[in-house]
């Protein structure tokens, strides 16, 4: 297991720039090459580079797992093509909300999603990502993809998450769930870490105790 720290042009919110699964990572063009090498090393994945809807905030805008990738409705065809060529299912989320990566907390077992997404959106998510899809919140935060992070072994969620919310995540994703923070106390763990079951890249400002908790909860030791 490899866990490394990184920032992008001084920004420790590494999860905003990169979306990753067990098999691949989608990285923004503005991410420096040395950070891309760390991603490859830590996660042991194939890396492709593209913007999403013309933005470098790939992690915030794209929801991925090993089964597929969900783009926002303003995504461009050449961006979608880059990910489709990885051989995974690709579709556009039918929603006016564009930050798809922030709307969806997923691993290869299922997904917890923003409570305001309609039934048609949930059907598309299930078709692309597979597994069970359930609406929910984490600590009063509707953008569950920003408030949580998961791999195939564990999940870490917003420290304000209730027992009921944590149980729902555990049931849907099929993993143990713990609360935690990144980058010196940020509750938005999904923004501060990129992870799969083989390793993680965490925000540069993450403290030793935070890192230890993340490693334990995500079984990265």
Curated annotation (Swiss-Prot):
SMART domains: eIF6. Keywords: Initiation factor, Protein biosynthesis. The keyword Protein biosynthesis applies. GO terms for biological process: cytosolic ribosome assembly. One of its GO terms (molecular function) is ribosome binding. It holds the Pfam family eIF-6. InterPro entries: eIF6. It comes from the Archaea. NCBIfam families: eIF-6. Belongs to the eIF-6 family. Binds to the 50S ribosomal subunit and prevents its association with the 30S ribosomal subunit to form the 70S initiation complex. This is Translation initiation factor 6. The lineage of its organism: Archaea, Methanobacteriati, Methanobacteriota, Methanomada group, Methanopyri.
